[in-house]
Design a protein with these regions (language model features):
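Catalytic or ion-translocation cores adjacent to nucleophile or general acid/base/metal-coordination motifs
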Residues: 63-65, 244-303
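C-terminal alpha-helical cap/extension of soluble enzyme domains
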Residues: 237, 299-336
Length: 458
């Protein structure tokens, strides 16, 4: 009997609905990386290849984002796919609204919503402002939200329609129409939900094998309750750097996959060559968890490179000092000297002066309260190190290389091992589109191989 033959094209992986909705060739996206590491060059390269990626807006000013969007739209002037990151900003809701207004002016069709605990007025405005009916009366969803979630209670808020109280406020303020509000009441806030397992950067350390089945069940239950015309699409992110990992994600029911760490080590990534040299040499055990600078006081974690770097250990030391002491004056002379000579490379007074100037510029209403609170002042001085360590890495600074903060997950090491002794071994040969196509091509080949193996036992 002739052997069964299974050939799976990479275009067949994942959901056809995802490909159609976003106008892309593959059920794949390159996720946003903050401070423009997911750069204009990266986004335009992906768009020209018919692939989705998200420009990384975290930590960038509105003028910088405006300029980047102008350049992306100029390069992708035939309607090619691209998206932009939209970060929850509870400290500055007005800035979040101005960011959404900027996206609306630029005609951004897709956003990756990150760090949201619950829907906000700007996010709901973005979703509803894209809703309309065509000549035949069908609902047109002009704006897509890809919501990154790692917890079921947050996922549920995106799987439900937009909160009625936020919708009412938007209508009353004339920011969306009554028809858009009515259409939005029948649709989920996000049509794409990206389930984020243990990942680079901010992470809850989730396990994809646990999260994906739970999120699928939640998606199906809410879809039935709300009587949606079609199910919300589920994506998988975190830990995807090899064909085996990608195939596992699709097997768990992912409609699409999102990669991150592996794209930071490509020619187009907007970080320094020094960082890419480090990333290229990583193994699967060369990352660690460290306190997150932007959520320092609450002990949130990021995953970052450990190999050859002191950042994770020094960040943890600063957090422990914060927990043990009530003010900078409580630090003993030896600890203070260590911070000034090794961590900061400048005096604590200099760090505070720089930090105070930043607060006075961005949050003048909070300055007096901070100066009255020694604990808050200490937290801000320690948080300066996290900002500084990111700047060092992105600039490729030679003199403080050990303090680089490089967000990265073990997918990077897995990818490096997979491409060893191939043309993609060196990062200067790694183009973001080539990485995507190689990964998906080999994932499809692996699926075909497994189908043949199982077919032979049928």
């Amino acid at each position: 009997e002739a052997p069964m033959r299974f050939t799976v094209p990479p275009e067949a992986l994942g959901s056809a609905r995802f490909r159609d909705a976003h106008g892309v060739r593959y059920a794949y996206a390159a996720g946003a990386m903050y401070k423009g590491i997911a750069s204009v060059d990266l986004v335009t390269a992906m768009g020209r290849a018919g692939l989705l990626s998200f420009f990384g807006t975290g930590g960038l000013g509105l003028d910088t984002i405006d300029d980047a969007l102008t350049r992306i739209r100029r390069a992708l002037d035939q309607g090619q796919p691209f998206g932009v990151n939209l970060l929850s900003n509870p400290q500055e809701p007005d800035l979040e609204m101005r960011t959404v207004e900027l996206y609306l002016r630029h005609g951004v069709r897709t956003v990756e919503a990150s760090a949201y605990i619950r829907p906000t007025l700007p996010l709901v405005r973005y979703r509803l402002a894209g809703l309309s009916r065509d000549a035949a009366g069908n609902v047109v969803q002009g704006h897509h939200i890809v919501a990154k979630v790692s917890r079921a209670e947050v996922a549920e808020r995106f799987l439900r329609p937009a909160p009625p109280e936020l919708v009412r406020e938007l209508v009353e303020r004339g920011l969306v129409t009554a028809e858009q509000a009515e259409l939005g009441a029948r649709l989920p806030l996000a049509q794409d939900l990206c389930v984020e397992a243990d990942s680079a950067g901010h992470t809850d350390g989730g396990n994809a094998y646990v999260l994906m089945p739970a999120m699928r069940a939640l998606r199906d239950r809410i879809g039935e309750e709300e009587r949606y015309p079609e199910p919300v699409r589920l994506g998988a992110a975190g830990g995807i750097g090899t064909p085996e990992a990608a195939l596992a994600a699709f097997t768990l029911g992912a409609d699409f996959i999102v990669t991150g760490s592996i794209n930071q080590c490509t020619v187009e990534a907007g970080t320094s060559d020094a960082v890419k040299d480090i990333l290229q040499e990583l193994g699967v055990h060369d990352t660690d968890y460290a306190p997150a600078g932007d959520m320092f006081e609450v002990g949130a974690k990021v995953q970052a490179v450990r190999k050859g770097l002191f950042f994770p250990a020094r960040a943890q030391k600063l957090y422990e000092l914060y927990l043990r002491h009530d003010s900078l004056d409580d630090l003993d002379a030896r600890t203070r000297a260590t911070l000034e000579e090794k961590f900061f490379r400048r005096s604590i007074d200099e760090v505070w002066a720089e930090t105070r100037a930043h607060v006075a510029r961005r949050f003048p209403e909070r300055l007096a309260e901070i100066e009255r609170s020694p604990k808050q002042k200490m937290a801000l001085v320690f948080r300066w190190y996290f900002v500084h360590s990111t700047r060092l890495a992105m600039a490729g600074s030679a003199e403080q290389r050990v303090d680089y903060q490089i967000h990265c997950g073990p997918a990077m090491g897995a990818f490096n091992a997979w491409v060893r002794e191939t043309p993609l071994e060196k990062w200067r040969e790694r183009r973001v589109v080539a990485v995507a196509e190689h990964l998906l091509r080999e994932t499809a080949a692996l699926l075909g191989q497994q189908l043949r193996m199982y077919g032979s036992h049928a």
